[in-house]
Amino acid sequence: DFCLSRGLGDVYKRQLLVLTLAMLLSLAPAEVVFSGLTSTACWLIVSGLVIGIAISETGLAQRVSDLFTRYLDDSYTRLIAGIVLMGILLGFVMPSSVGRIVLFIPIALAIAHSCGFETGSNGQKAVGLAAAFGSHLPTFAILPANIPNMIMIGSAEKIHGWSPLFGEYLLLHFPLLGILKAIFLVMVLLWLYPDSPKPRPPAGPGRPFDFRESRLVLIMLVTLGFWLTDTLHQISAAWIGLAAATLLLMPGVGMVSTQSFNQKVNISSILVVAGLLGIAGLINHQNISGVLGGHVLSWLPLEPGRDFTNFLALSLTATATGMVTTLAGIPATLTPLAGPMSEMTGFSLEAILMTQVLGFSTIIFTYQSVPLMMAMPLAGIPMRHAARLCLILAALTITILFPLDYLWWKWLGWI
């Protein structure tokens, strides 16, 4: 991820080099080294790119953007804040970051175009990053909005017989990890990517829905319906998205031509993600996460009565675990240790489990989050911009939000 943050060369070539060396040195079997190519994340990105092309080429993204642009194009601050707010609101109705990003990124880019931002401009990058991060980071404070949340709930209920209520989870996390982090996101984007909107004149009176748009809306509604009900049918979001993408590519049925697919689907971005996930698989194959879980209790400075130190140690442990296991691995690694941690700190079991949220809502490197890795190629933004934003927001979160969270938890009586 250092390469991503510094923009050193073609990143996918570096990923392929690492994977090639892993095979030549027999560090792991091929199914581990190349697990990224068979992962759901890889195919989520492919399907997301195809769906995004369809939303843009049919004019549906422009149609939706026209509804919102008039309220956002008179102020750059209002534009970026509005995009972030729309992403957060989607988190309350769509329990999948992947679904939110696939739906929202093309619309946000159309809004950026309507505001006069050319591809590659500061404004276009800021809008794309606002849509990607706004749909993802603050929504960790909404109980069913992301996969790590659901893994934490499921493992806590299975192992410890407890799961949080929607309201208490929202009250504990949303004021700081949701609202205040969203404000930080807006401020950082305005600082990193200064620009001003130059609204384009309206294209003319609204046109009626044509057959291609109506067909795309129907496909999207069916896709979203399957995504929203995945707990019932147990079909992965990746295969639902791939089915939709395949349908959109079918001649006579779909809306994405072979020429558009060849020109607009960025293969190198897919290789970057597959490479990063393959490297993560190598780390897991070497059992680094297992070693971390086995020794973490002896490393931590936990002691009853030292509430602030205990809180920071637990939160930072969750954050560091995510760097090794990715975000979804945090609850899988730390939930079994919640009982001993509770005894060592004097915190309630519930409070111990809730500190995981501070960890998986703090993304330090982009490879930790599949939705972010998916969003960047979909938005056409180099990964280094997301990497830089992750590092800045992580620093603000650890130095400002973690201490404020401690005071908030204390005031609510969780500690």
What residue spans do the PLM features occupy?
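Single conserved hydrophobic/aromatic residue that forms the stacking wall/gate
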Residues: 1-8, 12
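Hydrophobic alpha-helical transmembrane segments of multi-pass integral membrane proteins
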Residues: 72-107, 302-345, 349-358
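Core transmembrane alpha-helical segments of multi-pass membrane transporters/permeases
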Residues: 34-62, 84, 88-89, 93, ...
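Interfacial loop-to-helix junctions that mark the boundaries of transmembrane helices
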Residues: 31-40, 164-175, 208-211, 229-240, ...
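Hydrophobic core segments of alpha-helical transmembrane domains in multi-pass membrane transport
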Residues: 5-6, 18-25, 47-52, 83-91, ...
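Juxtamembrane and boundary regions of transmembrane helices in multi-pass small-molecule transporters
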Residues: 100, 118-151, 155-208, 218, ...
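Structural signature of hydrophobic alpha-helical transmembrane segments
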Residues: 39-50, 100, 176-179, 236-245, ...
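Juxtamembrane helix-boundary/capping and inter-helix hinge elements in multi-pass membrane proteins
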Residues: 26-28, 57-60, 70-74, 111-125, ...
